[in-house]
């Protein structure tokens, strides 16, 4: 039992593992140590990046994995044979985002089975992989910018051909509206021959437009007549304008005509007939030739009759 305030002392092997970095001796023990270290490094990366938890991720496990990777990195720095392949500063403090990251694609590790040191050959240095990746990235970046120039040079004539073919199709469908537009667009682009061809096509447009108008007139029904604004005004009469919205079938001022039936109610009533029926109620006789020269008293009387009925 340890007294109060006493410190627990590590054993020799524990002290070496905890406080110091184990310095493996030369020989098979070194090979086994490097293999174990590489295996732990791979497993830690796999758990850190390719971890799909069914429950909530554990912060303690993430911290342990990060500490292990940081320790392996320090060993690699002290050995000086490999460049740091893992930067602890790039790892965010949030463990939730780390656990949901996808694993990077595994790089192929070439292994020489016929060599005398198979374990050493299986462990490919990360520096070589980084150098290879840098070279491939540089070559890809050098190749890709040259591709758009070739594509653009090859696509320009194709676009011109498609534009000209589209113009031809539009001119065939509606030559009257697009003949002038084609002449304006073809003048700055094409030579003088194209402008002369467009000028030749101009007189053909109105003739075809006339034929289209004649066909449209033929397709109209026989009773359809196109009238101008003056003809439309002359065809209408004042009776149609003033008394078009009055239903006179409901107002029968003569009791004898009420028994004539529905035929008499549906008969058209003109303004003169209406004024004749209203004449007995007025003080002065109203002439049929002057229906619109009534006094204000007569208008008031007519409104009273209409409202009362």
From Swiss-Prot:
Give the record's GO CC terms. Answer: cytosol; nucleoplasm; nucleus
Q: Where is this motif: Nuclear export signal (NES)?
A: 233-238
The record's annotation in PROSITE patterns points to:
SERTA
Primary subcellular site in the record, as a coarse category: nucleus
Q: Which GO terms describe its biological process?
A: negative regulation of cell growth; positive regulation of DNA-templated transcription
**Per the record, a Pfam family?**
SERTA
Q: What induces it?
A: Up-regulated by high fat diet in adipose tissue.
Does the entry feature the keyword Transport, yes or no? no
Q: State where composition is biased (Basic and acidic residues).
A: 8-18, 204-216
| Tissue expression profile of the protein | Expressed in white and brown adipose tissue.
Keywords from UniProt, A to Z, are: Cytoplasm, Nucleus, Transcription, Transcription regulation, Ubl conjugation
Q: What are the cysteine partners in each disulfide bond?
A: none
Segments of this protein annotated with the region Required for transactivation activity: 230-306
Q: How is it modified after translation?
A: Polyubiquitinated, which promotes proteasomal degradation.
Q: Does the keyword Ubl conjugation apply?
A: yes
Oligomeric form and interacting partners: Interacts with XPO1; which mediates nuclear export. Interacts with TFDP1; modulates transactivation activity of TFDP1/E2F complexes.
Role played:
Acts at E2F-responsive promoters as coregulator to integrate signals provided by PHD- and/or bromodomain-containing transcription factors. May act as coactivator as well as corepressor of E2F1-TFDP1 and E2F4-TFDP1 complexes on E2F consensus binding sites, which would activate or inhibit E2F-target genes expression. Modulates fat storage by down-regulating the expression of key genes involved in adipocyte lipolysis, thermogenesis and oxidative metabolism.
Could you identify this protein by its name? SERTA domain-containing protein 2
